[in-house]
């Protein structure tokens, strides 16, 4: 939770960026780590269609500075908007959302994707609450070419409408209807989303809301080695998918 403020800081320094976050089991290739990245703003379908989406929202909570949390009613999957101008307000509003999201017993944070960008002096963060890592159509590694399978594991960009398929065949066969079905499948259902909205209202209206602080969690430092040479050999200790093939063991 405490790292969310980095999104606001980045957008303050680089207002033309779009920043996105993939939580664990929400788009990263390995389910036990997360993505925090940025790219050019204004290219995602979520953003190109924003004039339509922003006209039909239901406000859940507004603070004294006019910063707010809203439901984006017309988006294909459940989505919440945090609209802020200050770093403090942004962090506090996200805290209300974070506290309201369901969290599995063995997880250390709720499943979610976040897409954030600037609109003038406003900071917009869209939070996509998740309940599944991958849709049922995602192929088993033992049968990657199974009929009807689609190698789509939605992350923040996919949830924002830019669905990326590693396989050309999946790209050609994917329809708008199937894409929406996939996004809804990995998102909270209507009942779960209604519960989140209710909890946000309850949390935001508690007298102690302003003092709620999530404990900081120290993130491990990961060092990745980079090697070069005319010939590189390494071994994989499990099965991995690369270029539509299952690979394992010694690689050259």
Where are these regions (language model features)?
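Conserved, single-site charged/polar hotspot
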Residues: 210-252
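HIT superfamily nucleotide-processing domains
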Residues: 1-212
């Amino acid at each position: 939770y405490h790292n969310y403020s980095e999104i606001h800081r980045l957008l303050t320094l680089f207002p033309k960026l779009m920043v996105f976050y993939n939580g664990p089991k929400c788009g990263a290739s390995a389910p036990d780590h997360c993505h925090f990245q940025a790219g050019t703003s204004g290219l995602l379908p979520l953003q190109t269609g924003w004039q339509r989406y922003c006209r039909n929202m239901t406000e859940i909570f507004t603070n004294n500075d006019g910063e707010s949390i809203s439901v984006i009613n017309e988006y294909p999957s459940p989505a919440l908007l945090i609209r802020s101008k200050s770093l403090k307000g942004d962090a506090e509003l996200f805290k209300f959302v974070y506290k309201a999201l369901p969290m599995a017993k063995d997880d250390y944070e709720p499943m979610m994707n976040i897409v954030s960008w600037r609109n003038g002096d406003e900071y917009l963060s869209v939070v996509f609450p998740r309940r599944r890592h991958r849709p049922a159509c995602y192929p088993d590694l033992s049968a990657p070419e199974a009929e009807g399978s689609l190698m789509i594991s939605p992350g923040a960009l996919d949830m924002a409408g830019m669905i990326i398929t590693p396989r050309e065949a999946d790209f050609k066969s994917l329809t708008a209807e199937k894409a929406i079905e996939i996004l809804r499948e990995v998102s909270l259902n209507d009942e779960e989303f209604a519960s989140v909205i209710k909890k946000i209202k309850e949390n935001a209206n508690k007298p102690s809301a302003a003092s709620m602080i999530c404990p900081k969690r120290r993130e491990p430092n990961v060092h990745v080695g980079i090697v070069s040479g005319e010939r590189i050999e390494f071994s994989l200790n499990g099965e991995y998918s690369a270029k539509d093939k299952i690979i394992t063991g010694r690689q050259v």
